[in-house]
Amino acid sequence: MTRLRTGALALLVSVAFFGCGDDGPTDPPVTTLTLSIVSGDAQVGAIGVALPAPLTVQVEDQNGDPVSGTTVTWSLASAAGPNSSLSSNSTPTGTDGRASVSFTLGDAAGTYEVRSSVTGSSATFSVEATASGALSVVSGDGQVGLAGQTAAQPLVVKAVGTGGVPVPGLEVTFTVTQSAGAGAAVNPAVATTGANGEASTTLTFGDANGPVSVRAVANGSTADFGVYACGGDASAAVLDLQPGEDAVVSGADLACLQLPAHAVGAEYEVVVTPLPQALGFNDMTLAIGGSAAPSPAVVSGTGAQRASFSLFGAGADLTGWRGPQYDWDTQLREMERPLRPSIRANAVSGSSFGLMAAAPQLGDVMDFGFSCVTQTQFPNTPTDITAEVVSVSNNAVIFEDTLSRGAFTAAEYDDIALNFDNVIIGTDTLYFGAPSDVPGDIAPGQVVILYSQGVNQMTEDYTNGFIAGFFCPLDLGFSGGNDAKMFYLLVPDPTGDLTPGNDANLLTKTNVLRITDNTVAHEFQHLINAQVGTGAAEEVWINEGLSHLAEEVVGHAAGQVEGLTDFAPGNELGASDFLQSAAALEVVNKWYLGNWVNLGFYLDAPGDTAALLNAEDPLGMETFRMRGANWSFLRYMLDRFGDPATEWQLTRALITDAATNSRQAVTNVFGVSFDQLAAEWAAMLVVEDRDDLGGPVRASLQTTSYRMRDIYDNPSIGGIASPTGSWPLMPASRVLNVSSSLNMDLFTATSSYVTLRANAATGGTGLRLMETGTGADVNPAIMPYMAIVRTK
């Protein structure tokens, strides 16, 4: 026991000794660890699938330096469902202080939490498992490519889960389920979705033209691609056109057209025109099958400064005034349609025009109703007009509103009447037929022309357009009418006092004379048509087209009176003819320019308007564009099928044809289907008067009355008549050897234009017209026609 006590005492002494010493050893410093998340948090994946990115943490000491060799422990803190797993329960940190683990989501959708920890510190990851990962097509669907070649676009799908969240890490299997030929394949057959949920594969088409279907499958979800091989099929027919040759294709042939191999510089013009029975928009896509390259930008025209060659002189613009006029005309034609049987009956029961001698005399005063005009629509207008006879000729009686006395001098009124006798009536009756008196006609054998400020008052602001004059069908023997073949025309208003807008200097006497002569020629056709027209002649589009033709052919007659002997159908008038003299300019301003302005609007945007068959433009512009198209179509048919000396027989036949619709009437009179004519007229517009063609086009794709490009390209005329200042039709541009497409949402009987040009040698090209979006064949009810002209 003594030794035990001695030993204990010795130990105590020893401890005391070392405890009191100044240079003895110290305890090692304590290290504090901090763990933080680096990446992998907030991931989303499909149930049962490993997350695409590992869960990564970093361990640092109290100085912020990475700590290597430290063990990080991993554990599942919470789970939405069973069977989730970690690749390891512990991992050491590397030299960068980082440690990672992979995590596979469980079998239920929801939140999973994984806890990472080291001594004294921890961090928790929260990730999401989403149900199924539903597939949808992202891109590549509906494309067209060459048989045996790789598709220009990859086939891309996207997997999304609950709430539309992308699902990465999902295996997607791609399979060709249909092919028109052998050898169709996808590569890779299995692809994994990336962080954006997308997976893709590349398709090689089979060796034959036709549809190809590819299905993508993942986790029981499917997505289907429908694409088409067109072009490069050695066993299929090839549309081999030489420069100058053309073809008009319709029906099932539009599913795929093969063009041959081409050298650099080969060129085609392609014009697509839908001609269904129903009026409406028709959504289609023209697909070009070529090599894999992006589509070039669409070519568009550039505007040019307008010249001073204008109806209203320098600094003023012709194009606006006709808007209200055209809108009012359309309303009157719609009012007229149900009255036409009675109008014709009244014309038959009345006296023959021109045979009765009794007529109003100079100085006679009469009261007129302001027919067809309501104060509800035109609140500033009168209900009745008192007017005095100021001029009488063989065929015209001119009245002047007593409130507008002195609008013109007596000599000027006589000139107006003589112009009607010598120019307007002879031409209009030759082309469209003779009018008839109505029972109780106030001017038997003559036309009444009433100048009244009431017409001015139908407009509130001249600068926004105005109504120059009109013919009211109620005057042809109906209650509320005046029992006369008559026209209402505005009067000069140089100070603008007759409208609330007070627009001075627009309606000068000179301008009104220019406008009203043209208006009478236009409205006289409507009057004649109402009395003698049958069947389809009542349709607004063809009725208005004929009235615009009246402006033109009366202009020819006016030119002849002025000694302009070349102003006649078939003479291919060009800019130099229009600008040859002051007399020519006056004729062009008065009679021709309106039609060229209207057509210029149409050519500037043919795919953005209505053209043939329609009563009004659904996209606005007060029917400027469609009226230009209507006139051009009629002039084209007269040039193609008529003789300059006898073309009037065709217009008369068109007015009196008994067909119940205009399509059939056109077919009956011209002997070619309306649809074929409409497609070829549209093609004519893109090749007419071109001097850069590689070969002459057929005569039916040309006009004989005008050199259209020459007229528009002249800055003095194009500066007014064209929105671009020159030739306005600018087709979209695509490359023959490049896979691309062009969407077309076209109104019935309206066209879309595209130029196809080879910028490199090509082994062949395919053209397919298809439904937009689905890539399916176009619905046959749309009745599309495709005119193709090889230009180089």
In which residue ranges do the predicted regions lie?
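Bacterial N-terminal signal peptides that target proteins for export
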Residues: 1-8
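Bacterial N-terminal signal peptides
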Residues: 8-16
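The feature marks long extracellular or luminal low-complexity segments
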Residues: 20-234
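Solvent-exposed, conformationally flexible loop/turn segments
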Residues: 46-50, 96, 146-150, 196, ...
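Zymogen propeptides/activation segments of proteases
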Residues: 234-411, 415-419, 423, 427-430, ...
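Juxtacatalytic substrate-recognition/specificity segment
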Residues: 394-539, 543-546, 550, 554-560, ...
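Acidic/His/Gly-enriched intrinsically disordered linker/tail segments
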Residues: 537-629, 656-680, 684
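Beta/coil-rich, acidic/histidine-enriched accessory regions frequently appended to metallopeptidases
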Residues: 657-792
